């Protein structure tokens, strides 16, 4: 689901003035405003930023038909994007293998995950200051540029750069849609609406593998990306149009009086430079990238860990992270991360859970498709079905979770007593079952466990951060939660790549028969070469054993980190969302 995990997965009636603490966070469940108290105040929030006021005005003037149309278009956009995601996931090992660098499958995603996660906090400011439609349009543009670059790439460096553009755009677009849902749904219905929007995964999961096969066996992977570079802008335009039309309608109705600013162009540049904390973003993104990338790239250096490049990247990355912390505390006029929101234990706990889930997920998932194709001798299509059990199960189960949240009015119990424990069970069992000569049915069973658990955790962690704050801060806390998830994903991919590059080539060289040892480097770097050896041959058995050893260490690490997530879930307040109304206007 969020890209599904992830991606990971991912309101306006008249309201009474919410009771909030100084940071804008809601108090304990007993202090939340009651639904009966919020009957007749249609005016816009006086202290809200321009983007929030714009969406409040928009939802007061649009019709029920426009609201339904917007949700239908969001579903269609999600359908197309998830279909493209499924295809891309199946193509990725072949794209990197085409450059003889299959082991960089995880590395190509590390930088994109870091930047894709960090971009959401500045994007939250864009949405709150300038408006939702503007942010949506910018992100669609970035996504399209990424697809065009992937279609035209001739080396793994260009492909990695394309991944950055793509994931910035995709994560940003998904995030904007999440904010739209938060703007247009009552809190008690929000989990169900998030689940509805993610439901296309249930259908598109069956299409990704066959679609990748069609392009690989036909015009090539480049046309796979090129086709969606045309389709994506076409299907996103109607949603932007309905946003823009109703904003104009609200403006014409006088709900949004013009604001004049006396700043010059230079003053505006300076204002937004500090408002978006550009220095902080550069320090954090550069520091994380330089610190994490060497763990997956060291095996390509002659001296490996003793390489001056690897050592200098780790040291400089660490120093930049320290510089970021010092700058944010002592020098930044506007902090990149809203630390005052993180003081709330529910927000902090949800963010830590998101990070730990993504660390775990990307540790065990990064080479899962390759494992299935090599060790279990599955086709791309068959492997995609098993990999995507998570997407199917999580999206289906999230609908059940949404109904349970609406019925019970609470969400903590679902994560604490079901979601996180079942995730630990599913990942832990795979330590034994994801090995050569083990019946694939056991792997499928574990995937189902993790899928139902994931559908619970993703929805409840998002509900936790939204329920703990007022409408004014929803965009920010969702951005913070997503940033933790994406950085967790980057860390998980780093750990996966480090384990893979440290274990697989060493065990491969150890297990290969003497006559094949000269080809170890070629086998290590190319999935198609690995598949070329017949099943049952000494070379294929050696490759399978090396895969099994690498997977075992990945799964041990993925299971261990989940203990942090269980503790984080215990931190949440047990907020009753039935009694809490955040939004204005016509909502679901």
Curated annotation (Swiss-Prot):
Induction: Expression is induced during iron deprivation. The chain crosses the membrane at residues 60-80, 104-124, 133-153, 161-181, 191-211, 225-245, 278-298, 307-327, 348-368, 385-405, 413-433, 440-460, 473-495, 552-572. It is a multi-pass membrane protein. It is found in: Membrane. GO terms for molecular function: transmembrane transporter activity. One of its GO terms (cellular component) is plasma membrane. It comes from the Eukaryota. Glycans are attached at residue 519. Keywords: Glycoprotein, Membrane, Transmembrane, Transmembrane helix, Transport. Major facilitator transporter involved in siderophore transport. Belongs to the major facilitator superfamily. This is MFS siderochrome iron transporter 1. It comes from Ajellomyces capsulatus. The lineage of its organism: Eukaryota, Fungi, Dikarya, Ascomycota, Pezizomycotina. The gene is MFS2.
């Amino acid at each position: 689901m969020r890209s599904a995990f992830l991606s990971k997965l991912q309101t306006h009636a008249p309201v009474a003035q919410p009771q909030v603490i100084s940071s804008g966070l809601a108090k304990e469940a007993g202090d939340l405003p009651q639904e009966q108290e919020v009957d007749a105040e249609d005016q816009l929030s006086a202290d809200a930023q321009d983007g929030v006021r714009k969406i409040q005005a928009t939802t007061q003037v649009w019709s029920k038909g426009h609201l339904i149309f917007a949700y239908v278009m969001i579903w269609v956009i999600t359908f197309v994007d998830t279909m493209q995601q499924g295809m891309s996931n199946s193509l990725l090992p072949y794209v990197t293998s085409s450059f003889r660098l299959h082991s960089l499958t995880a590395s190509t995603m590390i930088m994109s995950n870091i930047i894709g996660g960090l971009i959401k906090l500045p994007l939250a400011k864009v949405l709150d200051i300038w408006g939702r439609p503007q942010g949506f349009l910018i992100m669609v543009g970035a996504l399209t540029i990424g697809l065009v670059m992937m279609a035209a790439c001739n080396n793994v460096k260009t492909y990695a750069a394309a991944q950055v553009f793509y994931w910035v755009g995709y994560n940003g677009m998904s995030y904007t849609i999440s904010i739209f849902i938060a703007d247009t749904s009552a809190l008690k219905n929000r989990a169900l609406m998030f689940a509805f929007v993610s439901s296309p995964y249930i259908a598109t999961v069956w299409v990704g593998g066959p679609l990748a096969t069609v392009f690989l066996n036909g015009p090539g992977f480049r046309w796979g990306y090129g086709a969606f570079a045309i389709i994506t802008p076409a299907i996103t335009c109607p949603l932007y149009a309905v946003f823009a039309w109703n904003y104009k309608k609200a403006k014409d109705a006088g709900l949004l009086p013009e604001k004049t600013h006396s700043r010059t162009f230079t003053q505006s540049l300076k204002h937004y430079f500090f408002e978006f904390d550009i220095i902080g973003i550069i320090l954090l993104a550069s520091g994380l990238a330089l610190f994490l990338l060497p763990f997956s790239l060291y095996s390509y250096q002659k001296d490996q860990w003793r390489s001056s490049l690897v050592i200098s990247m780790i040291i400089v990355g660490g120093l930049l992270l320290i510089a970021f912390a010092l700058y944010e505390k002592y020098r930044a006029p506007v902090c990149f991360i809203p630390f005052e929101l993180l003081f709330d234990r529910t927000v902090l706990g949800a963010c830590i859970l998101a990070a730990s889930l993504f660390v775990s997920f990307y540790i065990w998932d990064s080479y899962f498709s390759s494992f299935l194709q090599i060790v279990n001798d599955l086709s791309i299509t068959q492997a995609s079905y098993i990999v995507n059990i998570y997407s199917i199960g999580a999206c289906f189960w999230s609908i059940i979770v949404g109904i349970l949240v609406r019925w019970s009015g609470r969400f903590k119990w679902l994560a604490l007593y079901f979601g996180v424990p079942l995730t630990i069970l599913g990942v832990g069992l795979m330590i034994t079952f994801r090995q050569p000569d083990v019946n694939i049915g056991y792997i499928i069973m574990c995937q189902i466990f993790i899928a139902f658990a994931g559908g619970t955790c993703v929805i409840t962690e998002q509900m936790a951060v939204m329920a703990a704050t007022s409408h004014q801060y929803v965009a920010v806390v969702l951005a913070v939660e997503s940033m933790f998830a994406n950085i967790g994903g980057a860390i998980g991919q780093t750990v996966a790549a480090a384990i893979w590059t440290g274990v697989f080539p060493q065990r491969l060289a150890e297990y290969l028969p003497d006559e094949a040892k000269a080809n170890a480097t070629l086998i290590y770097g190319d999935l198609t070469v690995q598949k070329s050896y017949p099943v049952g041959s000494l070379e294929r058995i050696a490759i399978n054993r090396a895969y099994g050893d690498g997977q075992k260490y990945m799964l041990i690490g993925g299971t261990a980190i989940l203990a942090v997530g269980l503790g984080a879930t215990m931190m949440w307040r047990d907020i009753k969302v039935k009694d809490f109304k955040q939004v204005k206007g016509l909502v679901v």
